[in-house]
Amino acid sequence: MHDFVSHILRQYFHATNWNEYNSYLHLTSCSSAILDFCVPTGLSLSISASPTPPFFTTYRLGALPNLRAGIGYIYASTDSKIDFGGSSKDVRLKEIIERFRIVEARAPAAFKSKEKEKEYYWLAGDRYPEQEALGDLGKKERGGGEYLVYGCMHVPSARLDALWTKRISPTWQLIVTAVSSPPRYPLNALQNAAIASRSAYSTGAKSTSSSMDRLDSSNPSLSSSTSLSNTGASTAATTAAAAAAAAAAQDTYGLGPPGSTNLQFTLQRDTGRWFTEYSYSIDDALWGFRVLHNFGTPADTASTTLAALSEGAVETSSSASYPQRNGSVLHTGSSSSSEDTEAGGGLRGRFSAGAEVFISTVEKSAGLSTGIRFSTLPDTPQQPLMIAPSFDSSPSPHQASTLASAPSQPPTVITATLNPMMGHLSTAYAARMARDVVVCSRFDFNVYSYESEWTMGAEYWLRKSGGGGGVESVEASDADVPAPMNRIGSTSSIGGLRGHDETRQARFQEEHAMSLREASEAVSQVDGNTGDGGTSVFGLLRDPPALAPSAPSPRATCANSTLSHLLSPITGVLKARISSTSDIRLLWQGRLSHCLVSLGVKADLSGTHGASYSVGGAPASPKMGIVKSIGLEVMYFSQAEDESVE
């Protein structure tokens, strides 16, 4: 689970339209989310808040195994508001939990007429005017000027972490990070060690000078010929004595290593098909370069259609206010048949290849790695469907089967990385086998030592049994489901708005661009189905006359159960991994009350219980058991209430 700082940083990238997953650094993020998840150690508590929209505070406390704490502050300046979920109670779990996902790289959209080709150009997936018109725009319209500042102080180590990122242009971004660690000893120990070192240095210098005087007085004929060599010898002896005295003082007074400060600059450029990254670290003079190239245009299949749907969202929302009913399904997309886009066997996707190079001028060392990735493309929605509000008591089996229909191909990501200097080769395969089940396997091999490791893991999303309506059900639905299916679930479960405050009602209507007429019809539909005879939530339409209850048909019951399971809210995720080295990890992440909880355990099957015995028969130190660590992490965050909302 992402901590609050990482969550805010990712939402900042989303608010500024920056795709961080297009970097070579995230080439294997899909498999790492399933196989390399972190298990919390000990007990930790995190409390965060947002007093004002651009300002965030976070406090972290760890009780076990050692007492530690940290306090941090975040300030962001963006054109659009950062939507971090509001609170830990309302945030979508799939936004804050590190999970398997397929993120499309931004690409130039192909839906533009020939008459407007001279007026606009496409850059990083966004449309901009020509250079003549671009010069008249301000800095905000150009995409620059947005920044984020973060600082955190850790206790008791007094380590300071800082981050500053600034959006230079629509395709350029600068990130500066700093880590400062103070010396690990108190001031009184430092003063005592300095006095001891000074006295040892003076004593060594006096003894060296006295020995040289005795040598000169005993043999004056050699004094003139060996003056230069004696001077060098005395200097070396003095330096060695001072170093030995300093080392002895450090051991005597318990002095630790001196403090250090590392400052790193990272410059990133994203054009959709190309992502380049330049970095420099001051501490060890480490230069780095990363590059990732996406073969083919991401807009070949799904992205173009999704871009067209996003451009026509205004027309869709306006037409949705006065729908033309065709049974209970509205066709808002194009009327092209699905037979035109059907392909043969195999997976349809796109390849991405990249590499990274690091060179340290101080340590005279270098590093190199390269990798390739294949990811499937999402389905192209040919006919987006939206259930129109009606007074039917239950959805038809056709609608339920449409909701529960699986994609034409399972979302799959295949990666392969190679480190030629270390001889390390790694291949990974991750796929979504069901709506809530993702499996992944990875094989690591070293060509020099012939050592290998096989790792397998899975994640399973838990849902509330019986289903739950309301906004939480809609917000907790699968984010990977195409937009039409999300629109279906949102409209069919709008009746669950009853009992929520007006703020959620307004937010729900704004997100789905629905008119009050549709909302009132949907609420009246629920009231008519329940037969409670109460008034509507919005109070815009009269309640329909109560109908005599009738026994539901088996087909309607099956459809209702399918729809209820589809709209059931997510309560958590269960992750597990096992490797050939007997390393086992189990992690549960979910929401309890208003808090986000992570509970994990790490075990090693090669460990044995009991004490081991030495050669003489005396018992030695006992070995660690199978369970290596158990951890619990609780996170809570909220924001100040908006007083402008009545």
Curated annotation (Swiss-Prot):
The keyword Mitochondrion is annotated on this UniProt entry: yes
Ranges of compositional bias, category Low complexity: 207-230
Subcellular location per the Swiss-Prot or TrEMBL entry: Mitochondrion outer membrane
Disulphide-bridged cysteine pairs: none
Pfam families attached to this UniProt entry: MDM10
Region (Disordered): 206-230, 315-347
Biased composition (Polar residues): 315-333
Predominant location category: mitochondrion
Residues annotated as transmembrane: none
GO biological process, one term: mitochondrial outer membrane translocase complex assembly
Domain of life, per lineage: Eukaryota
Family: Belongs to the MDM10 family.
Subunit annotation: Component of the ER-mitochondria encounter structure (ERMES) or MDM complex, composed of MMM1, MDM10, MDM12 and MDM34. Associates with the mitochondrial outer membrane sorting assembly machinery SAM(core) complex.
Function according to Swiss-Prot or TrEMBL: Component of the ERMES/MDM complex, which serves as a molecular tether to connect the endoplasmic reticulum and mitochondria. Components of this complex are involved in the control of mitochondrial shape and protein biogenesis and may function in phospholipid exchange. MDM10 is involved in the late assembly steps of the general translocase of the mitochondrial outer membrane (TOM complex). Functions in the TOM40-specific route of the assembly of outer membrane beta-barrel proteins, including the association of TOM40 with the receptor TOM22 and small TOM proteins.
HAMAP family (UniProt xref): Mdm10 (MF_03102)
Free-text domain note: Lacks alpha-helical transmembrane segments, suggesting that it resides in the membrane via beta-sheet conformations similar to those predicted for other outer membrane proteins and porin.
Stated name of the protein: Mitochondrial distribution and morphology protein 10
This protein's encoding gene: MDM10
